[in-house]
Structure formats: C-alpha cells, structure tokens
C-alpha cells in the first residue's frame, strides 16, 4: 500500500488515487483487481485491518475505473463486486469508481414541513417515456422533464420508488442486488443527482423509497460474499 488509505468503505476517491476497503472476515487474502491494473488479481494484495476489514490504496485508480475484489477462500478464489459500490456496469457486472462530490452543484433548498407536503409517488421507469423506443424504460433525465407539470399540480414532494441496482431494466425496484448503487438503466448516480437538483430548484423535495430488509431472487453477488459456508 503506497499511501495511508482514506477512511470509509467501498471505493473512496481522493486527490492521490482511490482507497478500496471491504469487510470480508472469512477471507484468507483479498486482492483488488480492475481496469487500473489490467485486471491482474495477483499483484495488489489488500492489507488486513482489524475486525475483518481489508484495504488497499491504489494511486493509479480513478473515477470511472471498473473493479472487483478477488477473495481467497479455503476452497479457492472467487471474484466479487463491491457491496458498497455507488455505481455498477449492471447488476451482474463490475463495480465502478464514482466520486459523490465531482460535479456536485450546491443550492439553497429547504424542505416544507411534514404537514405541508403534497407527495407524488413516482416510478422512474414509466413516469415519462415520451420519445423512447417501445421497450426502453424511462430515466431520471426524462422524469426531470415533467417536473414543471408536477409543480403545476401543486406537488411539492416526489417519492421515487426504489432505484437501487436490480436485475434487468424493468422493475418496481423491490428486488435490489446492490443497496448503494443506483440503477444504471435509470441513469445511474449521475442521473439521480440531476433529478434531485432539478427538483430542488423548483421547490420539490425528493423522498427515497429504499429496500434494505431483503434482496431480490437474482444476481445475488453478495450471497456468501467471502466464502462463508
């Protein structure tokens, strides 16, 4: 490890590279592999920290690099995506380094009091499909195009149905695969950030419907993550 790692979990972006950290208490060894090291899963061995955590700071890793963890278990080596990934190529693909603060625009916004909220429940995939192909789902950018319409109805808050990464493109969102990653077909974390910004400048609050108590039946890369039996 070339430098003191940054604090946090997942892929933490800093001025001198990216720190990767994962909790894998049953692993014998963990390596980080990705586009920054030509997907070689034998050269960048992560340091075993306390309480089952593993970390590695890679000075050459950057935003939009893809990566996985190569976990050595008693029965062999397995490759797993990052449970804390903020972005995925797809629900059964690679994790992607994402910087929450890059391109972030600040603005003044204050949510109305609870007793004054007029909430519209919104499904991103079907709310606005105007101009899209028959089987193409809507996304955050298309949804943002109709925010003025919602405002004209007196709506001052939208509750978006779950947008955590799920298998396929068509879903209500209650079958998540990665709890911190934003569904790619909806526009990923960049799309969500755009939607929130456009909502706030119109005085519309954004409420997230989240699913943390269960996962879906497919693309369960987190199952037996570090080889536990």
What are these regions (language model features)?
Residues 1-19, 44, 48-121, 126-135, ...:
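The feature marks proteins involved in alpha-glucan
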Residues 22, 34, 58, 71, ...:
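Glycine-rich, histidine-containing beta strand-loop boundary motifs that form or position
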Residues 111-114, 123-229:
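Substrate-binding/active-site clefts of carbohydrate-active enzymes
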Residues 23-30:
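Short proline/glycine-enriched turn/loop motifs at strand-loop junctions of beta-rich domains
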Residues 30-32, 67:
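Short beta-strand elements bearing conserved aromatic residues within extracellular beta-rich modules
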């Amino acid at each position: 490890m070339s430098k003191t790692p940054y604090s946090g979990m997942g892929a933490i972006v800093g001025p001198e590279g990216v720190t990767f950290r994962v909790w894998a208490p049953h692993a014998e060894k963990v390596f980080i592999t990705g586009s920054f090291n030509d997907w070689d899963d034998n050269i960048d061995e992560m340091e075993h920290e306390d309480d089952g955590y593993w970390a590695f700071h890679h000075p050459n890793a950057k935003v939009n690099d893809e990566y996985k963890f190569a976990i050595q278990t008693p029965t062999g080596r397995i490759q797993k995506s990052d449970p804390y990934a903020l972005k995925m190529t797809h629900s059964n693909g690679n994790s992607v380094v994402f910087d929450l603060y890059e391109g972030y625009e600040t603005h003044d916004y204050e949510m109305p009091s609870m007793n004054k909220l007029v909430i519209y429940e919104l499904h991103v995939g079907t709310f606005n499909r105007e101009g899209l192909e028959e089987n193409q789902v809507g996304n955050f950018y298309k949804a943002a195009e109709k925010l003025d319409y919602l405002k004209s109805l007196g709506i001052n808050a939208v509750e978006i149905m779950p947008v955590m990464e799920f298998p396929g493109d068509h879903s209500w969102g209650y079958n998540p695969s990665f709890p911190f990653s934003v569904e790619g077909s909806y526009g990923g974390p960049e799309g969500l950030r755009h939607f929130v910004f456009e909502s706030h400048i119109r005085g519309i609050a954004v409420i997230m419907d989240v699913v943390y108590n269960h996962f879906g039946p497919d693309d369960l890369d987190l199952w037996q993550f570090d080889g536990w039996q």
